[in-house]
């Protein structure tokens, strides 16, 4: 769908860097930043947005509309990055986990998880 190369890890890291500046303890201003507003409200606010965006992604995928799928995925990922920032995590943590799982079958990976 895109013609230009996008370096995903770089983009994710830059967004994460920006989100860190939006954290309340780093002076994020809820009056001037949507992310700062979500972060100031706390987990209930951004977790609700994750649920909404996930539902919108499901609907876009059911409709088979590639441009909407990409747009809704971007919205979902953004709100996931907000969540990571709140918990002092980085996209690199998620990428490392994906790399760890790479090459494993999903069933094998699931079997290796500790029981809850």
Swiss-Prot record:
Belongs to the PRA-PH family. Keywords: Amino-acid biosynthesis, ATP-binding, Cytoplasm, Histidine biosynthesis, Hydrolase, Nucleotide-binding. It comes from the Bacteria. It is an enzyme of class 3 (hydrolase). The keyword Cell cycle does not apply. It comes from Bordetella avium (strain 197N). This is Phosphoribosyl-ATP pyrophosphatase. Pathway: Amino-acid biosynthesis; L-histidine biosynthesis; L-histidine from 5-phospho-alpha-D-ribose 1-diphosphate: step 2/9. InterPro entries: HisE, PRib-ATP_PPHydrolase-like. Its main location: cytoplasm. GO terms for molecular function: ATP binding; phosphoribosyl-ATP diphosphatase activity. Its EC number is 3.6.1.31. GO terms for cellular component: cytoplasm. It catalyses: 1-(5-phospho-beta-D-ribosyl)-ATP + H2O = 1-(5-phospho-beta-D-ribosyl)-5'-AMP + diphosphate + H(+). SUPFAM superfamilies: all-alpha NTP pyrophosphatases (SSF101386). NCBIfam families: histidine_hisI, PRK00400.1-3. It holds the Pfam family PRA-PH. It is found in: Cytoplasm. GO terms for biological process: L-histidine biosynthetic process. The keyword Secreted does not apply.
